[in-house]
């Protein structure tokens, strides 16, 4: 495999049965002051390179594609996830022995992804000809101005995930510019649409006054000469939304693999190629150089 090809990258996180406040606060940098950045970088095992002076460059995209500073929503991410799950009527299975904990066999209810790509490509989109060392957590980058290119890439990626899973199910789209490589964290709820059960009913609409609508029973009760004043309309079945990881991402390992492969292809066709990024491939198939450049 040819190495060092500028590629797009999509990393899908572990399946989630719940979502913690701690994970959400990190994604949105809530409560992250300079001391928190320092403590994060002190963890040598994780090899972090968070730069506090670039915190103000982080941003998120919210409903209708509006770009705002990261953490602008007063409602924390974990609470927004729960709000959407409540709207969908999702109830996790609770552990019988530990009623306050979600059971291990509870369905997955949220999926997190990281969209990124070749370090140099995204660097140029974000910083242009401003030369900075993104791997230096102590450098002063307070003078750096984020370029329009990275906003366009993020907006294109946001539009893509909205088309894929529905804007109402994109709970967070957070772009981090304070680490070594630029990337977007996307937190979603997997939702399928299913037809409501039951018989499909009909209604009768008055030809002269559309506001007059009768049920079949009411229409039949009319004198025969009056029935001709109504037009029959067959009601289509409505759809209901429900949380279903398996129906969205695949019910088998093979189906999930095929879904992920198609996801990479679709993202390349709709977004990646616009920015000179080749189609992403599974992380384990990357060369060592590509693993370094795409994480």
Per-region residue spans from a language model:
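N-terminal nicking endonuclease/strand-transfer module with a His-rich metal-binding environment
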Residues: 1-295
């Amino acid at each position: 495999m040819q190495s060092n090809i500028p590629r797009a990258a999509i990393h899908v996180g572990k399946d989630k049965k719940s979502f913690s406040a701690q994970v959400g606060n990190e994604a949105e940098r809530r409560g992250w002051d300079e001391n928190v950045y320092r403590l994060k970088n002190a963890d040598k095992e994780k090899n972090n390179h968070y730069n506090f002076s670039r915190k103000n460059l982080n941003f998120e995209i919210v409903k209708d594609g509006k770009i705002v500073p990261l953490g602008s929503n007063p409602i924390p991410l974990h609470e927004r996830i729960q709000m959407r799950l409540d709207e969908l009527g999702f109830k996790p299975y609770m552990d019988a022995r530990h009623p306050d904990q979600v059971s291990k066999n509870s369905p997955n209810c949220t999926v997190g992804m990281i969209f990124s790509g070749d370090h140099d490509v995204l660097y140029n989109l974000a910083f242009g000809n401003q030369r900075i060392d993104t791997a230096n957590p102590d450098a002063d980058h307070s003078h750096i101005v984020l370029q329009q290119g990275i906003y366009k890439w993020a907006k294109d990626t946001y539009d893509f995930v909205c088309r894929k899973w529905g804007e109402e199910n994109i709970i967070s789209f957070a772009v981090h510019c304070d680490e070594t490589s630029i990337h977007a964290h996307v937190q979603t709820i997997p939702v399928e649409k299913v037809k409501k059960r039951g018989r499909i009913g009909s209604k009768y609409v008055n030809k002269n006054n559309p506001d007059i609508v009768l049920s079949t029973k009411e229409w039949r009760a009319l004198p025969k000469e009056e029935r001709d004043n109504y037009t029959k309309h067959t009601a289509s079945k409505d759809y209901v939304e429900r949380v279903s990881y398996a129906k969205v991402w695949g019910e088998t390992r093979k189906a999930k693999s095929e879904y992920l492969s198609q996801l990479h292809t679709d993202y390349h066709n709709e977004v990646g190629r616009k920015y000179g990024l080749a189609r992403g491939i599974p992380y384990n198939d990357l060369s060592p150089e590509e693993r370094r450049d795409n994480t």
